[in-house]
C-alpha cells in the first residue's frame, strides 16, 4: 500500500527510519551553519572595505625606525602598507617627515668624506696635523740654513778671507784705488797687480813686471808696499804669513822708501825692546 510507505516496511528493521531522519536534520543544520558563515565573512569584508583610512605620523613609525634604521618606512610598518594601499596621495606626506628621516639616520649629520669613508671632523684633524708637520719641517730647514751660513762665515773668518776689497793709496797720487785681496794667493801676485795700477815713467821702476813686483817687497826700489792693521799700526808687507796678513789688513799704501825705511827701523827697534824685556824677565 502507498499509505504505508512512510512507515517501516515489512523487510526493513524498525531503527532505519529514525537514522535517516537524523541524517537529514544534521545535513540541514550544516547547510544553515555554512550559509551563516558565508554571510558573516561577507559582512567583515564589507566593514574592512568601508573602514576609514588614517594618516600615519612620526610617532607611529618611530619604534620601527629605531629597530631597523636602514629599512624603508613602507616595509617597517604594516599599518603604513595598508594606508598606502588605501590612499596613494596621502602616503608620501606621512613617510617624508623630517623627524622620520632624522630618527632613521642619527649619524648622517656628521658627513662622510672620501673613500674609505672618513668623517668630516676626522678629516679636519688629519689636515691640521699634516699642516703642523709641514710648518715644523720648514722651521727646521730655515734653522739649518742659518746655521750653515753662520758656519761658513766663521770658517771664512778663520781662513782670513773677510778682508775683501781694501783701499790702496800711493805717495804723490791724489786718487786712490781698491784691490780685492781674495783674488790673490801670495804677496807676489798682489805686488804685481799694484804695480800695474800705479806704474808711470816718473817712478823710475824697471820695465819688467816681475822685477818691479819683487822690488816693491824690498828696500831696493823707490817705493815700498806697507799696510795698516786692525790696531791702526803701519807695517811692512811680507813680514807675516799671507793668511795672517789678509785677516789683519785694513788698507794698503805704496810709501816712499825713505819713509818706509824709518818705519822698518822703528818696527825692528820695537821687536828688540820686546826681546830684551823678555830676556830680563
From Swiss-Prot:
InterPro entries for the chain: AUX/IAA_dom, AUX_IAA, PB1-like
Annotated GO biological process: auxin-activated signaling pathway; regulation of DNA-templated transcription
Induction field: By auxin.
Domain (PB1): residue spans on this chain: 163-259
Keyword Transferase: no
Predominant cellular place of this UniProt entry's protein: nucleus
Region entry Disordered, spans: 1-115, 130-157
Ranges of compositional bias, category Basic and acidic residues: 133-157
Tissue specificity: Highly expressed in flowers. Expressed in shoots.
UniProt entry keywords in alphabetical sequence: Auxin signaling pathway, Nucleus, Repressor, Transcription, Transcription regulation
Sequence motif EAR-like (transcriptional repression), residues: 36-40
Task of the protein: Aux/IAA proteins are short-lived transcriptional factors that function as repressors of early auxin response genes at low auxin concentrations.
Entry protein name: Auxin-responsive protein IAA10
Organism: Oryza sativa subsp. indica (Rice)
